[in-house]
UniProtKB/Swiss-Prot annotation:
Keyword match Transcription: yes
DNA-binding residues (ranges): 43-62
Protein's UniProt name: HTH-type transcriptional repressor AllR
Span list, region Disordered: 1-20
Species, as recorded: Salmonella typhi
Amino acid sequence: MTEVRRRGRPGQAEPTAQKGAQALERGIAILQYLERSGGSSSVSDISGSLDLPLSTTFRLLKVLQAADFVYQDSQLGWWHIGLGVFNVGSAYIHNRDVLSVAGPFMHRLMLLSGETVNVAIRNGNEAVLIGQKECKSMVRMCAPLGSRLPLHASGAGKALLYPLTEEELVGIVVNTGLRRFTPTTLVDLPILLKNLERAREQGYTVDQEEHVVGLNCIASAIYDDAGSVVAAISISGPASRLTEDRFISQGELVRDTAKDISTALGLKPPVA
């Protein structure tokens, strides 16, 4: 008969397990607090609101940062919800929310435009690609899912920006700067604000080789039932095919698709 022996002293594992559970509960509480705070907060506010020692709060934030659940703003020192939270919650997104609703509309847009269709969400000061329908052309422009895009220099990024107030836009620019990626990147704030104002009026924005030379994108914002921007839908193609003379017709197509998705998410049309 085989004898099973236990390692360690009796009862030794229980306190360790309790400490681990407590740390997990506190980490979840921090993420929930960040969510209630609009996605970001200072370590002192987190510590005070959750009644945690400052040193404990900072240690837990560093653990969450290592898993990409949070990240720290290098200028202000504030902590923000990170991309890891999206990765863990991707199963929910696939079962519901934007992608599950947008799927048929993305396919229709791909067929009508002849270009690759993308859906992106905002994560902090970047746009993140979460969905894609590749076009059937031999030459197509496709970025891998999870790709991060600059807000000021990409179609999807600008579509996530143009519904915001000027104060919010300036705040983002202060945090991120206006890095130049190509000769046509908008790196002057007044010009960028004017570009976004025009996009707001027409319901779509154009990225004319502003992020990648040879790549043009047209994008529009998607809204939820509360009227909040939740994502952006875009088409992307080589500049030799998605040419300037097609921007208006394709822009209206992207805009109308974004409206259809927003309606499917519960957005009510404005009362005339």
